[in-house]
Regions:
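Membrane-proximal envelope and lipid/glycan-remodeling enzymes
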Residues: 1-397
Length: 397
């Protein structure tokens, strides 16, 4: 009995130490990466302030803010409410002065910790578990998103939080009511992420068909309350439970406006420019030192994160890898037909909507390839993203 209690205390102590390592250290690095920052485009702070005042609209926004909805003499956001809800304790203390970017850094660090837990539950051990965690936190666009922290990037980081919680639960006790709830959290930040439910429900259908209805119902029981909350949020503002505001959006940046007037917000005509950005867009080459810098439009995923090449080495005969790839593909589709490609950004920020799922396949590939090559790809990815963050800060993105 004494031995059991001692072992449990030791286990709790180890977990606490890893929490310190994988939350405080990444947060510290994110903080130091962007100490002096422009305190702008923090729409969610204003939304959170409105919630605390019992309002659903936004007041006293700076004039330069974009991506807004003007509806019946009020200003609204088309974005789901979870990022604003999570800010409420901070806004209750500091009001509009709350630095959204710091909260984004905190959730970015929590995401890194969840990746560490996830990899352990995926039976990735030893130095590769460490390397993959570093890769996620500092070798992907998660790094730059976490230290930019404006409305668009903060929403991505919170959505990652929900998806990673769902994956951690799935690779753990597989309580599908919690998996559904966590995916609901992701949905309340970035709605396209709900398409990642294929990963969990597809696994049920493939591996546990006799429990598909039971577990699928449990998933729905966890997800439905959050879906209903989003529906109420829509109805309370626009009188339509299915209208989030995107189709009512009427204030765009000057860059987006011409295409929107021709094609609308969503159109298949936008797919080619997304494909170009994702797979072939190069950085900007300069005639003088430093000779190269990232473009504000973005940069292809292979240069941004060379470890993505590990996808070609992944075990695509593994049902989980297949489902991870399919889920990532499905989640990517709504963004592919959207007018904006994510500008201004380092890399391709919409990849964050499916990075947690894609990372399952990346982890598979990095473990299967020669370790020297795997570590080279991880190191290159970190170097590129440190370079990217340098320019993000220098250029004021």
């Amino acid at each position: 009995m004494t031995t059991t209690i001692s072992t449990e205390k030791q286990s709790i102590k180890q977990i606490f130490l890893w929490e310190i390592l994988w939350i405080l250290v990444p947060f510290g690095i994110y903080f130091l990466s962007h100490i002096v920052h422009p305190d702008w485009y923090k729409h969610f702070v204003y939304q959170s302030w409105g919630f605390l005042q019992g309002r659903l609209d936004l007041l006293n926004l700076p004039e330069y803010y974009v991506d807004l909805i003007y509806w019946k003499d009020k200003i609204y956001l088309p974005n789901p409410p979870l990022p604003s809800i999570l800010l409420m304790p901070f806004v209750a203390i500091w009001g509009i002065a709350t630095e959204q970017i710091r909260v984004c850094m905190l959730f970015g660090a929590v995401d890194v910790f969840l990746v560490w837990i996830l990899l352990g539950r995926m039976t990735v051990q030893g130095v590769m578990r460490f390397g993959l965690t570093i890769l996620y936190g500092f070798g992907t666009v998660h790094y730059s998103a976490s230290i930019i922290g404006t409305i668009w990037f903060y929403a991505h980081v919170v959505a990652e939080w929900g998806m990673l919680l769902a994956l951690v639960e799935f690779f753990g006790k597989r309580r599908f009511v919690l998996v559904g709830f966590f995916m609901g959290l992701a949905f309340l930040s970035r709605q396209a992420t709900i398409l990642g439910s294929l990963f969990f429900l597809g696994w049920l259908l493939w591996e546990r068909p006799e429990k598909w209805i039971q577990k699928g119902f449990s998933f729905g029981a966890g997800f439905t309350p959050l879906f209903l909350f989003q529906s109420w949020f829509n109805w309370a503002r626009f009188g339509d439970p299915m209208e989030s505001g995107y189709m009512l959006q009427n204030y765009y940046s000057s860059v987006q406006a011409p295409a929107i007037h021709k094609y609308g917000l969503f159109n298949f005509a936008y797919i080619p420019k997304h494909i170009k950005l994702i797979f072939t867009e190069m950085p900007e080459f300069l005639p003088q030192f430093p000779f190269i810098r990232p473009k504000p439009e973005g940069m292809n995923i292979w240069l941004t994160t060379p470890a993505f090449f590990a996808l070609f080495a992944a075990n695509w005969f593994d049902v989980l890898v297949i489902l991870a790839g399919l889920s990532a593909f499905l989640i990517s589709l709504p963004a592919m037909i959207y007018t904006a490609t994510g500008w201004v950004q380092f890399g391709y920020r919409y990849a964050l909507d499916y990075l947690p799922f894609l990372f399952v396949a990346i982890a598979s590939g990095l473990q299967r390839m020669p370790q020297a090559l795997a570590w080279t790809l991880i190191a290159l990815s970190v170097i590129v993203n440190v370079w990217g963050v340098y320019w993000v800060v220098k250029l004021g993105w």
